[in-house]
Amino acid sequence: MYQTNKKATTNCIGIEYLQNAFEPEEIEELENNLNKFGIKLKTYSSAPKYIMGIEELFPQIQIFLSSDIAQAIYLGIASSAIWDGIKLFFRSLKNIVKKKTFTHVSNNKVNTKATPNIHVTIGESHIVLPIDIDDSKFEYFVDKMFDSMDKDIVNEEKYVFYDAEKQTFEYYTRHEVTMKSYQDWKEKQNSTETTTEE
């Protein structure tokens, strides 16, 4: 295991995470799984931070695919070994994260069963990993996550969310994510006020 800068090179996956999000043996497991498929893992841990903004825009764990891997996937020329390695990586990551305790503090409320915000970053696009869905739906997500991505989407700042019920990918700009978050907050506030009045 080695920590380096965030730039991913040929056949490489980078992972940036908050300190203490993973144990050394968990990173080693991810690294060993990728090595079997000829893919290197580069890691970068950063100090925990307070977020003053829309949470969906700030991942606690961020995954970077090297441009060579991303391009091979888009062109449909990724070897089965690389594709199998990527699928195993995401499956292993989900299993590791689901066993861990993440704490979220907001408005003086502490949630000790929080799900971390995980992004897969390709170019300017961020695919938000749906960790809270069952394994079969997650497998489907991983199989399909690159299908609708193309060069234009990758070159624009987009946030990609997966709707497990509809099995669709929804694309939003940063502004749209902000507006959606505000609308959700507003509806929640109105709902709370209505309940209080009753």
Segments and roles (model prediction):
Residues 1-65, 87-198:
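Short amphipathic alpha-helical segments that predominantly mediate membrane engagement
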Residues 72-96:
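Ordered, amphipathic secondary-structure segments that act as subunit-interaction surfaces
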